[in-house]
């Protein structure tokens, strides 16, 4: 006997997306945003309809992502940022708290809030993940957001 599997169609058409982007390491985060908007368009969405909110850095993403998710005209939020390791423990605090805060916001709002924050050792690694050889993690985050919206719709049917 075969189990019933929920297999939602991956289309952005009709999905109201918001993206919160950290301004810190802006050279990288702009590339993540570009990749995210391109992915949304590839999935059938209109990038002009995406709500984008710039925040000072990755530490501020959870609050803004939560507020965006609370809006009735938003189905999912993608949080984009870049935290690059330095010589102090600042990296661990920012990256860990951003991840934890975004998870809490997602569970509280019951809307997908996708972690698209790069955590790398060097600026070069960040560039690679923002459109270089390692792809664009902003695009991957949008694919995840759309899949989650469609999966939650399928579960609710």
Swiss-Prot record:
The UniProt entry's GO CC annotations, sorted and at most eight, read: riboflavin synthase complex
Q: Where does (2S)-2-hydroxy-3-oxobutyl phosphate bind?
A: 87-88, 129
Q: Which Pfam families match?
A: DMRL_synthase
Family annotation (Gene3D superfamilies): Lumazine/riboflavin synthase
EC number of the protein? 2.5.1.78
Q: In which pathway does it act?
A: Cofactor biosynthesis; riboflavin biosynthesis; riboflavin from 2-hydroxy-3-oxobutyl phosphate and 5-amino-6-(D-ribitylamino)uracil: step 1/2
**Which leading EC class covers this enzyme?**
transferase
Instruction: Extract the GO molecular function terms from the UniProt entry.
Output: 6,7-dimethyl-8-ribityllumazine synthase activity
Q: Which reaction does it catalyse?
A: (2S)-2-hydroxy-3-oxobutyl phosphate + 5-amino-6-(D-ribitylamino)uracil = 6,7-dimethyl-8-(1-D-ribityl)lumazine + phosphate + 2 H2O + H(+)
Binding annotation for 5-amino-6-(D-ribitylamino)uracil = 24, 58-60, 82-84, 115
Q: Which UniProt keywords apply?
A: Riboflavin biosynthesis, Transferase
An example Gene Ontology biological process: riboflavin biosynthetic process
Active site annotated at which positions? 90 (proton donor)
Do you know which InterPro entries this protein is assigned to? Answer: LS, LS/RS, LS/RS_sf
Please give the function described in this protein's UniProt entry. Answer: Catalyzes the formation of 6,7-dimethyl-8-ribityllumazine by condensation of 5-amino-6-(D-ribitylamino)uracil with 3,4-dihydroxy-2-butanone 4-phosphate. This is the penultimate step in the biosynthesis of riboflavin.
The entry sums up its family as follows:
Belongs to the DMRL synthase family.
PANTHER family from the entry? 6,7-DIMETHYL-8-RIBITYLLUMAZINE SYNTHASE (PTHR21058:SF0), 6,7-DIMETHYL-8-RIBITYLLUMAZINE SYNTHASE DMRL SYNTHASE LUMAZINE SYNTHASE (PTHR21058)
The protein here is known as 6,7-dimethyl-8-ribityllumazine synthase
Q: What is the lineage of its organism?
A: Bacteria, Thermotogati, Deinococcota, Deinococci, Thermales
Q: Which gene encodes it?
A: ribH
């Amino acid at each position: 006997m075969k189990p019933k599997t929920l297999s939602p169609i991956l289309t952005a058409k009709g999905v109201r997306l918001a993206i919160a982007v950290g301004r810190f390491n802006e050279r990288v985060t702009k590339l993540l945003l570009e990749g995210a908007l391109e992915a949304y368009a590839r999935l059938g969405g209109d990038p002009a309809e995406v709500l984008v909110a710039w925040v000072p850095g990755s530490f501020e993403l959870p609050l803004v992502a939560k507020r965006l998710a609370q809006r009735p005209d938003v189905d999912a939020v993608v949080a984009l940022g870049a935290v690059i390791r330095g010589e102090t423990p600042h990296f661990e605090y920012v990256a860990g708290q951003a991840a934890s805060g975004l998870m809490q916001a997602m569970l509280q709002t019951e809307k997908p809030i996708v972690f698209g924050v790069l955590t790398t050792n060097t600026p070069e690694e960040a560039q690679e993940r923002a459109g270089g050889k390692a792809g664009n993690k902003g695009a991957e985050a949008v694919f995840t957001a759309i899949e989650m919206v469609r999966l939650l719709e399928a579960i609710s049917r």
